[in-house]
Amino acid sequence: MVWEQRWHPLRREWVIVSSHRNERPWLGERVAEAARQLPEYVPDCYLCPGNARSSGTRNEQYGGVFVFDNDHPCVAFTAPVPPPAPPDGIYRNSPAHGVSRVVCYSPRHDLTLAQLPEADVLGLLQALQAQYRELSARAGVRHVLVFENKGEVVGVSNPHPHCQIYATNFVFKTIESEAEVQAEYFAAQGRPLFPEIIHAEEADGRRLIARREMALAFIPYFARYPYETFVAPRATRASLADLTAQELQDFAAVLRETLIRLDNLWRMAFPYVMVLHQAPTDRPYPGFHFHIEIHPPLRKPGLLKYLAGPEIGGGNFLNDTAPEEKAAELQAVSNVHYTQGGEGRRRAAEGGDGEGS
């Protein structure tokens, strides 16, 4: 049992870890697993090749990664200039300017990122590198946020595999805070902060999920969610676009293996919110270390990690599981996707692949 506070050095906040609470009685809502018996093509899906979107624009007959401007953008350079703020000086407003894009991973409606071949995952990351380079060079763009929402329980409106890009005239708060923390650490210590986290995780070893020469994945000591996983290059790079070809190849392999292990845990399309933490683009940010954070909302099959009083009201996360225990579960499953012959949890007594849980 783990029952303590753990310091989150990137966010400068305490995470309450109380693993005994995961076994508490539960009479509340359970979420059903979304059906994965999906066809390869859906005629009325606005992301499938050749189909019309709500704007009337018809998608290309694409065969790989497909990128287009979002028909319902969060930010746009065509957004109107807001009216003057109230005159009392307390309230302020600002234009919501930027670029919103959708990135389809595959023409196949029935696949997820975890099911794509490694070469296709690499191709996606290369496409995202190109998007970052293009958008970060635009006047008025201060930050390029890339994220994927996967699964109905996180509010996804379409299961066709895709992510989104918001290139904005402001810096999203979490990234702004992380950039400040890492810059301050770099100025004070003369070295980046994130490699210290990597060193601590490798020295401990219990929370590691996947490793290659130039990249690794782990559930951090200070994880806020059950199964929250970081995927990072070993070298400090400010953005995905800064990774070398070999670094990107290892990063793609580690990311894919991590997502496969999550799916294999309960033999399902594991839901998550996945965010690329990249340095803002408006100026240099010394010491910023690009990485991906994966935030799965489930703590058990059918049971969500709800954000409630401590998180929403108090501002500190309460993790009902021990990161070491959750990492051990992911370590114990196959790195071959269950739809391709991989298994779920291994039988500890046999030390090999066993029946899926």
Language-model region placement:
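Extended C-terminal subregions enriched in glycine
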Residues: D250-A269
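A contiguous, surface-exposed recognition patch within enzymatic or periplasmic domains that forms
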Residues: F230, A238-E247, F251-L255
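Active-site microenvironments that recognize anionic phosphate/pyrophosphate groups
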Residues: M1-H160, Y166-A238, I260, P271-M274, ...
